[in-house]
Amino acid sequence: MAATASAGVPATVSEKQEFYQLLKNLINPSCMVRRQAEEIYENIPGLCKTTFLLDAVRNRRAGYEVRQMAAALLRRLLSSGFEEVYPNLPADVQRDVKIELILAVKLETHASMRKKLCDIFAVLARNLIDEDGTNHWPEGLKFLIDSIYSKNVVLWEVALHVFWHFPGIFGTQERHDLDIIKRLLDQCIQDQEHPAIRTLSARAAAAFVLANENNIALFKDFADLLPGILQAVNDSCYQDDDSVLESLVEIADTVPKYLGPYLEDTLQLSLKLCGDSRLSNLQRQLALEVIVTLSETATPMLKKHTNIIAQAVPHILAMMVDLQDDEDWVNADEMEEDDFDSNAVAAESALDRLACGLGGKVVLPMTKEHIMQMLQSPDWKYRHAGLMALSAIGEGCHQQMESILDETVNSVLLFLQDPHPRVRAAACTTLGQMATDFAPNFQKKFHETVIAALLRTMENQGNQRVQSHAASALIIFIEDCPKSLLVLYVDSMVKNLHSVLVIKLQELIRNGTKLALEQLVTTIASVADTIEEKFVPYYDIFMPSLKHIVELAVQKELKLLRGKTIECISHIGLAVGKEKFMQDASNVMQLLLKTQSDLNNMEDDDPQTSYMVSAWARMCKILGKDFQQYLPLVIEPLIKTASAKPDVALLDTQDVENMSDDDGWQFVNLGDQQSFGIKTSGLEAKATACQMLVYYAKELREGFVEYTEQVVKLMVPLLKFYFHDNVRVAAAESMPFLLECARIRGPEYLAQMWQFICDPLIKAIGTEPDTDVLSEIMNSFAKSIEVMGDGCLNDEHLEELGGILKAKLEGHFKNQELRQVKRQEENYDQQVEMSLQDEDECDVYILTKVSDILHSLFSTYKEKILPWFEQLLPLIVNLICSSRPWPDRQWGLCIFDDIIEHCSPTSFKYVEYFRWPMLLNMRDNNPEVRQAAAYGLGVMAQFGGDDYRSLCSEAVPLLVKVIKCANSKTKKNVIATENCISAIGKILKFKPNCVNVDEVLPHWLSWLPLHEDKEEAIQTLSFLCDLIESNHPVVIGPNNSNLPKIISIIAEGKINETINYEDPCAKRLANVVRQVQTSEDLWLECVSQLDDEQQEALQELLNFA
């Protein structure tokens, strides 16, 4: 359009008419007309847009549809485009916009348009409050306050709508104007003449409380609004409006404490609405959501009202029965997604969450009898719902259901023969869920009955949907089934799977049906993955059929089957190994290459993509360096997938409501009626592709060198990819492997890559919000330091790292204090304690990663790092105080162990910090702490120098006491005990003047061999070699009397896989055996005391060392 009006120059009539026509074109049914109009609109300057749109909104002669479009565009312009447009408007235009907007809101007579103007008003007000809370539109706030004090109901509605849309509109004045806010909300929520006012005031009150979620004092002041809010919830639901109920759900989720004074009323109302079949499904589900959400966010409060929860359970179960008699279900060839809008699915999810929230002690007694009655019903819907209820409560009622698991499983197994296919499918689903919830005990206890029953169900050719569910349950069962148990059934299982495969393959060829076949190939893959080399005898049975499926499945609707079959082939190849797989390797690689070529020309969301990415990685593992020739064909699409950028948007809540659930977007409410959205399709594929790049860098090393620059430039920015945790994990994991690859190209290239990686990696440690991802980042940083070595961090890096680690340690102590406070609160119970323990485990895990980073620094920098470390010293000393929890003491001692091992003799200057903690913790009840202390005493002897002599002398009796303890060799204690034995060996070897060697040596020899701690075991064997090679009389014994014992120690070392042929110690031990063999009598005496396994172990040692 020609419109070019500028500041101070009014638009001409023709320009306005052109713009109105443009607005009409934007709502034209013709796609082409709309697209042209959108292009013209986008090119109009922001000033012109603002003035034209505001004029159009106010012009009642323009027509409602045009005004509506103008309002939507102006709201969007002042929302997402505010920073680009409004600050660049001349001051007089900004003033005019604010004045015109107040007038427009005040004078508008059309109710719907007035709401849209209020939306625009709220958006502008939100953007005119700065970060300090200062309101730069005082006239707008004055208008709002005047509206509150007026007697005009329309102006009340305006004030409420703006306040609901932007509850922070008062800014810094809020504290002083709380009475005004409360007056507005109170007078409107009591208004019996105007239901719309009452509803809107309840929503505004909820929005205000949510906006002040951390202001506990405000909850008390505004608590007397709650009865009005609850009444508005009730009334609005029966007027077909669920908006206030949605607000109540938000309160339950974010500020449950606000509901405290009226919690029983809230629960009773929710129970009533949930059970009222006159209401819509959504309203009933929202009412149930209030109860379920409170079970998660206010568990202790809700446990005081278990009588209401007990009344809710029948309602939940009744909703689970709300199923349709769908005749097409039996013949469907697609496994449809759960309909989360249905009562049955929503109620099943609610029961699951309720059980997890309140625990089995509360929920199981409430549900058990109801479920048993449902399972006995003649109506299939009740039997189906009863089974799905059992499936839902398993995780939350885990501990309580263990004692009744036998009867429960036996009951569920009966329903695999139910006359109704939906019930049989539900029984399969329940068994699969139990296999997850009760693993691995479920597999160990029920393998015989469950495997046989699921295989029989798969053999039943009457219904492929049921077959598919049975196959899915078997896959889940196999995931946690020990290999030793699964191999017991492998013959019958293979026979069954192969016979079904043959039939399903024929059905695919004849009818194109694929559903059961998709699950079947995944089941075969799971079996191969679990039994590994035991699958070799069955390889030739399956591989031809699987390759045939890949060749056949070329149509679009068979892509998922093709992808799953490719995955299955790669799993089988990995299971049977390169030697067996090589007969088909070339053929399989050609199939993969053909699929890869097709994928390069297909949509980004092709279902084969993720399967292909994983399959290539397995082929790499199978073929090793032989895979290198295929890498150029694989890497480009992989990098393309890993580089994909997700669509993101910042939208008003109203825009979000207009978007379809099928658009693939997920939104997070940011408050103030704004939501952040991300299109999630493709994120999983991106994460998988990133993981595969890590894998190739790790496995191929020199074969990956030429791609390192491209990949590192991709991965480093992904450390801040907050849309998907696994992408950040992969980015972190890749760093040390990429550095290893870069080292092959030379030190200069390596240094350049480290310079690119180091700073973002350190910053990520400080900013990463997720504990699991943070641990991976910290682990990656520690490994990277070990790759780079001494001097890899400059002063700025060390300063930043020191600050971050200090903050992590201080946060660790602060979190422990907060947990102790929670343990003193009124609502503290076993459930709260479990939650606190989970938090503590997360904190301790991060502490272990702090220890890993310090270990890498001490091991590379040695004593040069100690001046930097001293800023952390008080915090590490605090960890080993006797009052600290045992994991703190364990990891604090480990850090000092590293200092002693890598920074001696300088480490002695810290001895007064750790001397007594090291000695006293030898008596600790926790074996992990004893192990850390014993290891420290051992490295003192080995690396500490003469200064540590007296401490080593003091340590010996303490170490001996632990070793001689009656339960020292139990599974729980053995690692700590073996570290004590190793420590005594180190004192004997490196500090012999601290102890009576001849007195201690016979005891030390009697404690050998070590079985569990391989690293310490090889050190003890090395010292034993020293003693034998020097013909130490105490070790050899009078008349060689100790040699049979020594030979048995060596044999056990081989059996326990302590002896590694690459270790020089292996050759020395073999030489000891050969030396004994030179005396036939002595050798026969030694051998006579060995069993067959020990003799075979010695022979193997002699053959290879």
Curated annotation (Swiss-Prot):
Q: Which domain of life is it from?
A: Eukaryota
InterPro entries in alphabetical order: ARM-like, ARM-type_fold, HEAT, Importin_beta, Importin_rep_4, Importin_rep_6
Q: What is this protein called?
A: Ran-binding protein 6
Keywords of this protein's UniProt record, alphabetized?
Acetylation, Coiled coil, Cytoplasm, Nucleus, Protein transport, Repeat, Transport
Similarity annotation: Belongs to the importin beta family.
GO CC aspect terms: cytoplasm; mitochondrion; nucleus; synapse
Family matches, as SUPFAM superfamilies? ARM repeat
Q: Where are the HEAT repeats?
A: 219-257, 361-399, 402-440, 444-483, 866-905, 908-946, 949-987
Question: What is the species listed in this Swiss-Prot or TrEMBL entry?
Answer: Homo sapiens (Human)
GO annotation terms (biological process): protein import into nucleus
Q: Report the coiled-coil segments.
A: 806-842
Where in this protein does the record say N-acetylalanine is found? Answer: A2
Q: What is its main location?
A: cytoplasm
| Family annotation (Pfam families) | HEAT, HEAT_EZ, Importin_rep_4, Importin_rep_6
**Cellular location(s):** Cytoplasm; Nucleus
